[in-house]
């Protein structure tokens, strides 16, 4: 098999030329991400590994190999650095209206104090500086800012299916992922924060891949999946979950991550489910 590594996705003309030159042999592209042209070419003899997305395409079939899941979260290689720290700061500022020092915010967000200082300067009127530290001018505004700008946790996801209730599946996956710091998000996370609708899909963030086949799950397509395990590129998820959990071991991601994942997975009443999570967050923020 001939392997071609490209720093940018190939154009349709480059793909056609490389396929001709391979003269019927197997050709493998290693690229940062998939494009429509690469997906189409994967139907006709081209194999593709999209490194940033953790996706392999062979003969038109898409795979997200469990073996490709890193043992620790890592930021995807990109020409543009993702501001994970700024998004984490937005989330922890929404936790309470009580002022906190930059050192306290840095600990909660899992970033450096210098990164906090830089991010606060960019938030302008959304934050207020007082004698005891920094706080959000309005928690709702920060929440909207996060939900409108956050691109997702990235990393590599593996889809699973089981016949148990989604809540039961989530508990089983949490137990299996105890050593990988598994936490809940999406529908099931919302059910633990502000119960409102029956969860349709569980999202689990873990620091390493989980082989859930050992506990009764089957690998699945994204469309049929009842549970997704994701090793995120965003390294701040555990810090913000810890901040919201207080002295307890976190079982659920922070509320804004949960709200984001509800919107990501969708559903006819996703907007209402998010509203219930944010309403609970607002109550806690107002209570200080």
Residue ranges and their predicted role:
Residues 154-236, 241:
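Short gly/ser-rich loop at a beta-strand->alpha-helix junction or flexible surface loop bordering the NTP-binding
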Residues 144, 148-149, 160, 164:
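Electropositive nucleic-acid-contacting surfaces
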Residues 211-288:
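Hydrophobic alpha-helical interaction segments
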Residues 83-147:
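Loop-centered beta-sheet repeat module
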Residues 81-82, 251:
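Residue-level marker of regulatory loop/turn positions in helix-turn-helix DNA-binding domains and
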Residues 1-45, 200, 206, 223:
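DNA-contacting interfaces and partner/effector-binding or oligomerization modules
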Residues 42-59:
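Charged, structured surface patches that assemble and position nucleic-acid processing machinery
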Residues 63-79:
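Short, Lys/Arg-enriched N-terminal segment that forms or immediately precedes the first helix
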